[in-house]
């Protein structure tokens, strides 16, 4: 593994000029493509489906992570099951609004994983362009806020023996951050980051 860490303004050899749509990076991921609130916001907006509709369509599933219940992309059945959003030609059908973990492939946050993609012809590209996330600095701040909130929730759950409250807390978190649309009721507009932070402040009061 290359242990050099990058900033989003750096150039890194991650772009596969000779990508032929093999789809290898979209198979066999089991339940590892974990989704955060921004991912659900993107998927819901892009596909025109609510959180519940995405689950009913078999696109999402829930998993337990140190006591916390969170969503992930539900791969098709089988050891090498494909992403449900992979098209028949081996291309991502939701590329413009794909989840954060998919965008990070080979860069993670932000270091380069050697041999993450076996295709030849890698060329350098600016990491911010590779990620393709608008307001990237704001997104990075949000990722940190969500990470530490989840860390605090898991720590809280680990120290509590109240299983009934743990269940209620998980249902509350799912409703506040995933089920409820990120829409301003007064005018129907959306400002994900401001709405997320309002909900984060609310959620922290119950810990």
Annotate each PLM feature.
Residues 1-207:
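Short loop/turn segments that flank or connect secondary-structure elements
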């Amino acid at each position: 593994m290359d242990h050099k860490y990058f900033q989003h303004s750096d150039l890194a050899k991650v772009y596969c000029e000779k990508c032929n749509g093999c789809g290898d990076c979209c198979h066999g991921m089991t339940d590892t493509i974990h989704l955060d609130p921004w991912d659900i916001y993107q998927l819901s907006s892009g596909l025109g489906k609510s959180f519940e509709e995405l689950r009913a369509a078999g696109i999402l599933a829930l998993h337990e992570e140190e006591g916390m219940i969170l969503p992930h992309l539900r791969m098709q059945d089988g050891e090498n099951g494909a992403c449900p959003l992979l098209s028949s030609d081996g291309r991502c059908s939701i590329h413009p609004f794909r989840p954060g973990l998919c965008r990070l492939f080979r860069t993670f946050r932000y270091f380069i994983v050697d041999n993450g993609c076996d295709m030849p012809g890698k060329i350098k590209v600016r990491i911010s362009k590779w990620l393709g996330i608008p307001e990237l600095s704001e997104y990075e701040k949000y990722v940190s806020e969500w990470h530490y909130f989840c860390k605090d929730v898991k720590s809280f759950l680990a120290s509590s023996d109240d299983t009934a409250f743990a269940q209620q807390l998980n249902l509350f978190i799912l409703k506040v951050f995933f089920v409820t649309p990120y829409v301003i009721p007064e005018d129907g507009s959306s400002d994900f980051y401001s709405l997320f932070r309002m909900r984060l402040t609310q959620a922290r009061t119950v810990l």
